[in-house]
Amino acid sequence: QFIVDLVKNKHINADTDYSIAEAAFNKGETAMTINGPWAWSNIDKSKINYGVTLLPTFHGQPSKPFVGVLTAGINAASPNKELATEFLENYLITDQGLAEVNKDKPLGAVALKSFQEQLAKDPRIAATMDNATNGEIMPNIPQMAAFWYATRSAVLNAITGRQTVEAALNDAATRITK
Protein backbone atom coordinates (compact mmCIF):
# COMPACT_ATOMS: atom_id res chain seq x y z
CA GLN A 1 0.00 0.00 0.00
CA PHE A 2 2.92 2.31 0.74
CA ILE A 3 4.13 2.13 -2.88
CA VAL A 4 0.59 2.54 -4.23
CA ASP A 5 0.24 5.69 -2.12
CA LEU A 6 3.59 7.04 -3.35
CA VAL A 7 2.35 6.70 -6.94
CA LYS A 8 -1.12 8.04 -6.15
CA ASN A 9 0.36 11.11 -4.44
CA LYS A 10 2.80 11.64 -7.34
CA HIS A 11 5.96 11.08 -5.28
CA ILE A 12 7.10 8.44 -7.78
CA ASN A 13 6.02 7.58 -11.31
CA ALA A 14 4.18 4.34 -11.94
CA ASP A 15 6.52 3.42 -14.80
CA THR A 16 9.77 3.90 -12.87
CA ASP A 17 12.15 0.97 -12.93
CA TYR A 18 15.78 0.57 -11.87
CA SER A 19 17.35 2.03 -15.00
CA ILE A 20 14.97 5.00 -15.08
CA ALA A 21 15.53 5.72 -11.38
CA GLU A 22 19.31 5.39 -11.67
CA ALA A 23 19.48 7.66 -14.73
CA ALA A 24 17.27 10.31 -13.11
CA PHE A 25 19.40 10.32 -9.97
CA ASN A 26 22.65 10.51 -11.94
CA LYS A 27 21.29 13.50 -13.88
CA GLY A 28 20.32 15.28 -10.66
CA GLU A 29 16.60 15.02 -11.48
CA THR A 30 15.74 12.95 -8.41
CA ALA A 31 16.42 13.97 -4.83
CA MET A 32 17.01 10.48 -3.45
CA THR A 33 17.17 6.84 -4.41
CA ILE A 34 17.69 3.52 -2.70
CA ASN A 35 20.65 1.74 -4.23
CA GLY A 36 23.90 0.09 -3.26
CA PRO A 37 27.68 0.17 -3.69
CA TRP A 38 27.38 -1.23 -7.22
CA ALA A 39 25.88 2.14 -8.27
CA TRP A 40 28.48 4.42 -6.69
CA SER A 41 30.91 4.53 -9.61
CA ASN A 42 28.19 5.78 -11.97
CA ILE A 43 27.10 8.39 -9.43
CA ASP A 44 30.72 9.47 -8.97
CA LYS A 45 31.14 9.82 -12.76
CA SER A 46 28.04 12.03 -12.80
CA LYS A 47 29.67 14.37 -10.26
CA ILE A 48 26.57 14.18 -8.06
CA ASN A 49 27.18 15.23 -4.45
CA TYR A 50 25.58 12.36 -2.55
CA GLY A 51 25.68 10.50 0.72
CA VAL A 52 24.57 7.15 2.03
CA THR A 53 22.53 6.77 5.19
CA LEU A 54 20.55 4.27 7.21
CA LEU A 55 17.29 3.34 5.53
CA PRO A 56 14.30 4.89 7.29
CA THR A 57 12.11 2.98 9.67
CA PHE A 58 8.72 1.77 8.48
CA HIS A 59 5.85 1.75 10.97
CA GLY A 60 8.44 2.14 13.73
CA GLN A 61 10.48 -0.89 12.65
CA PRO A 62 13.96 -0.81 11.10
CA SER A 63 14.08 -1.45 7.37
CA LYS A 64 15.31 -4.95 6.52
CA PRO A 65 16.99 -4.75 3.12
CA PHE A 66 18.20 -7.83 1.32
CA VAL A 67 21.96 -8.06 1.74
CA GLY A 68 24.01 -9.48 -1.09
CA VAL A 69 27.18 -11.34 -0.26
CA LEU A 70 30.16 -11.81 -2.55
CA THR A 71 31.32 -15.40 -2.25
CA ALA A 72 34.06 -17.57 -3.65
CA GLY A 73 33.78 -21.30 -4.01
CA ILE A 74 35.84 -24.24 -5.07
CA ASN A 75 34.45 -26.75 -7.54
CA ALA A 76 34.21 -30.20 -5.93
CA ALA A 77 35.72 -31.70 -9.10
CA SER A 78 38.73 -29.37 -9.09
CA PRO A 79 42.07 -31.18 -9.24
CA ASN A 80 43.62 -28.23 -7.39
CA LYS A 81 41.42 -27.90 -4.29
CA GLU A 82 44.35 -27.37 -1.93
CA LEU A 83 45.87 -24.68 -4.15
CA ALA A 84 42.49 -22.97 -4.53
CA THR A 85 41.97 -23.08 -0.77
CA GLU A 86 45.41 -21.56 -0.22
CA PHE A 87 44.65 -18.78 -2.72
CA LEU A 88 41.33 -17.94 -1.06
CA GLU A 89 42.55 -18.10 2.52
CA ASN A 90 46.01 -16.56 2.13
CA TYR A 91 45.60 -14.12 -0.75
CA LEU A 92 42.03 -13.19 -1.63
CA ILE A 93 40.41 -13.04 1.79
CA THR A 94 43.01 -10.70 3.22
CA ASP A 95 43.07 -6.94 3.59
CA GLN A 96 45.28 -6.62 0.50
CA GLY A 97 43.27 -9.10 -1.59
CA LEU A 98 39.95 -7.48 -0.79
CA ALA A 99 41.47 -4.04 -1.42
CA GLU A 100 42.28 -5.15 -4.97
CA VAL A 101 38.73 -6.42 -5.53
CA ASN A 102 37.34 -3.21 -4.01
CA LYS A 103 39.36 -1.10 -6.48
CA ASP A 104 37.56 -2.85 -9.33
CA LYS A 105 34.04 -2.87 -7.88
CA PRO A 106 33.09 -1.39 -4.50
CA LEU A 107 32.43 -4.20 -2.05
CA GLY A 108 30.36 -2.14 0.35
CA ALA A 109 30.47 -3.62 3.83
CA VAL A 110 32.61 -6.73 4.24
CA ALA A 111 32.74 -9.59 6.74
CA LEU A 112 36.53 -9.51 7.21
CA LYS A 113 36.67 -7.30 10.31
CA SER A 114 40.17 -5.93 9.74
CA PHE A 115 39.30 -4.75 6.23
CA GLN A 116 35.87 -3.48 7.32
CA GLU A 117 37.64 -1.28 9.89
CA GLN A 118 39.64 0.30 7.06
CA LEU A 119 36.58 0.72 4.84
CA ALA A 120 34.39 2.12 7.63
CA LYS A 121 36.37 5.37 7.48
CA ASP A 122 34.25 6.05 4.37
CA PRO A 123 30.83 7.19 5.67
CA ARG A 124 29.15 5.42 2.72
CA ILE A 125 30.60 2.11 3.89
CA ALA A 126 29.70 2.77 7.52
CA ALA A 127 26.07 3.41 6.51
CA THR A 128 26.09 0.33 4.27
CA MET A 129 27.25 -1.80 7.21
CA ASP A 130 24.51 -0.31 9.40
CA ASN A 131 21.93 -1.28 6.77
CA ALA A 132 23.47 -4.74 6.34
CA THR A 133 23.31 -5.29 10.09
CA ASN A 134 19.55 -4.69 9.98
CA GLY A 135 19.11 -6.68 6.78
CA GLU A 136 18.50 -10.24 5.70
CA ILE A 137 21.04 -12.21 3.69
CA MET A 138 19.62 -12.68 0.19
CA PRO A 139 19.88 -16.32 -0.81
CA ASN A 140 21.86 -16.96 -3.98
CA ILE A 141 19.41 -19.51 -5.34
CA PRO A 142 17.44 -19.78 -8.60
CA GLN A 143 14.15 -19.34 -6.71
CA MET A 144 15.02 -15.68 -6.10
CA ALA A 145 14.22 -15.02 -9.77
CA ALA A 146 10.67 -16.21 -9.07
CA PHE A 147 10.54 -13.97 -6.00
CA TRP A 148 11.61 -10.87 -7.93
CA TYR A 149 9.30 -11.61 -10.87
CA ALA A 150 6.30 -12.19 -8.59
CA THR A 151 7.08 -9.11 -6.52
CA ARG A 152 7.43 -6.93 -9.62
CA SER A 153 4.10 -8.21 -10.96
CA ALA A 154 2.41 -7.57 -7.62
CA VAL A 155 3.67 -3.99 -7.47
CA LEU A 156 2.66 -3.27 -11.08
CA ASN A 157 -0.79 -4.81 -10.62
CA ALA A 158 -1.38 -2.85 -7.40
CA ILE A 159 -0.17 0.55 -8.64
CA THR A 160 -2.17 0.30 -11.87
CA GLY A 161 -5.30 -0.75 -10.01
CA ARG A 162 -5.58 -4.12 -11.77
CA GLN A 163 -5.60 -5.74 -8.35
CA THR A 164 -5.95 -4.66 -4.76
CA VAL A 165 -2.73 -4.73 -2.77
CA GLU A 166 -3.96 -7.77 -0.84
CA ALA A 167 -4.90 -9.70 -4.00
CA ALA A 168 -1.61 -8.81 -5.71
CA LEU A 169 0.43 -9.95 -2.71
CA ASN A 170 -1.59 -13.15 -2.34
CA ASP A 171 -0.99 -13.97 -6.01
CA ALA A 172 2.71 -13.24 -5.57
CA ALA A 173 2.90 -15.55 -2.56
CA THR A 174 1.20 -18.31 -4.55
CA ARG A 175 3.66 -17.89 -7.44
CA ILE A 176 6.67 -17.85 -5.14
CA THR A 177 5.65 -20.96 -3.21
CA LYS A 178 4.77 -23.08 -6.27
Task: Name each model feature, range by range.
Residues D5-I12, D44-K105, T160-Q163:
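Extracytoplasmic/periplasmic substrate-recognition and gating elements
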Residues S19, S78-E82, I141-Y149, Q163-E166:
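Soluble non-cytosolic domains of exported or imported proteins
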Residues Q1-I43, E82, A168:
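Extracytoplasmic ligand-binding clamshell segments of periplasmic binding protein
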Residues F2, A150-G161:
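Solvent-exposed, amphipathic alpha-helical segments
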Residues Q1, T57-P65, S114-A120:
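Short, solvent-exposed loop/beta-turn-alpha elements that line the ligand-binding surface or hinge
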Residues T53, V101-A150, N157:
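Long, aromatic- and glycine/proline-rich binding clefts that accommodate carbohydrate-like moieties
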Residues F25, V165-I176:
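Short, well-structured alpha-helical segments that form the helix of a local strand-helix-strand
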